[in-house]
């Protein structure tokens, strides 16, 4: 069984943690501020520049929440101090992307261009017409935006065309073999 909930989370320099009543945690750092409401079954404390999570009982559900809470807090601490980024590659003839203000325009081989509204808290850069960098302080939001963009044209297994994560490997298939 994992003991991830028991790890002590080091608070980086320049990061401030506030614990309000009913487990509302606000973490402020150089990149921005994140707030999240956590379960009352988990007690969160700050001691000597460390975040400590303790569970109030030993039920299975509480143990699961303990590890989840610890991981979410670690993500918040990393987000406000360093930030998160996901890189996407676009492969295919005529497939490209461009950022116009708060919209991402994608040409993905459809009869119409795809417009994606960039949500607040996320920044998208088109490094090249075939490379996108999605960055922000909220790990969940950055990952969700990257997944939503990838869903417009997932990589297909025959030629590998589509939108994929930078270090993702596509398992290729062989095409139809000509019959005798």
Curated annotation (Swiss-Prot):
InterPro entries in UniProt: Ribosomal_uL6-like, Ribosomal_uL6-like_a/b-dom_sf, Ribosomal_uL6_a/b-dom, Ribosomal_uL6_bac-type, Ribosomal_uL6_CS
UniProt key word Aminoacyl-tRNA synthetase: no
GO MF annotation list: rRNA binding; structural constituent of ribosome
Pfam family, one: Ribosomal_L6
Keywords carried by this UniProt record: Ribonucleoprotein, Ribosomal protein, RNA-binding, rRNA-binding
SUPFAM superfamilies in UniProt: Ribosomal protein L6
GO biological process assignments: cytoplasmic translation
Disulfide bond positions: none
Source superkingdom: Bacteria
Record's keyword annotation contains Ribosomal protein: yes
Any one annotated GO CC term: ribonucleoprotein complex
Gene3D superfamilies in the cross-refs: Ribosomal protein L6, alpha-beta domain (3.90.930.12)
Role summary: This protein binds to the 23S rRNA, and is important in its secondary structure. It is located near the subunit interface in the base of the L7/L12 stalk, and near the tRNA binding site of the peptidyltransferase center.
Subunit organization: Part of the 50S ribosomal subunit.
Family to which this protein belongs: Belongs to the universal ribosomal protein uL6 family.
Name of this protein: Large ribosomal subunit protein uL6
């Amino acid at each position: 069984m994992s003991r991830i909930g028991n790890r002590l989370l080091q608070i980086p320099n320049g990061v401030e943690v506030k614990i309000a009543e009913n487990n509302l945690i606000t973490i402020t750092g150089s990149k921005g501020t994140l707030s999240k409401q956590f379960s009352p079954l988990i007690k969160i404390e700050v001691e000597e520049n460390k975040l400590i999570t303790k569970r109030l009982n030993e039920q299975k559900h509480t143990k699961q929440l303990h590890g989840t809470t610890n991981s979410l807090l670690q993500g918040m601490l990393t987000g406000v101090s360093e930030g998160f980024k996901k890189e996407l590659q676009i492969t295919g003839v005529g497939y490209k992307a461009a950022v116009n203000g708060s919209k991402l325009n994608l040409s993905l081989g459809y009869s119409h261009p795809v417009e994606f509204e960039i949500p607040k808290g996320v920044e998208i850069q088109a490094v090249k017409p075939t490379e996108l960098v999605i960055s922000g302080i909220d790990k969940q939001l950055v990952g969700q935006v990257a997944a939503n963009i990838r869903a417009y044209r997932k990589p297909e297994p025959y030629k590998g065309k589509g939108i994929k994560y930078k270090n993702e490997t596509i398992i290729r298939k062989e095409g139809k073999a000509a019959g005798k």
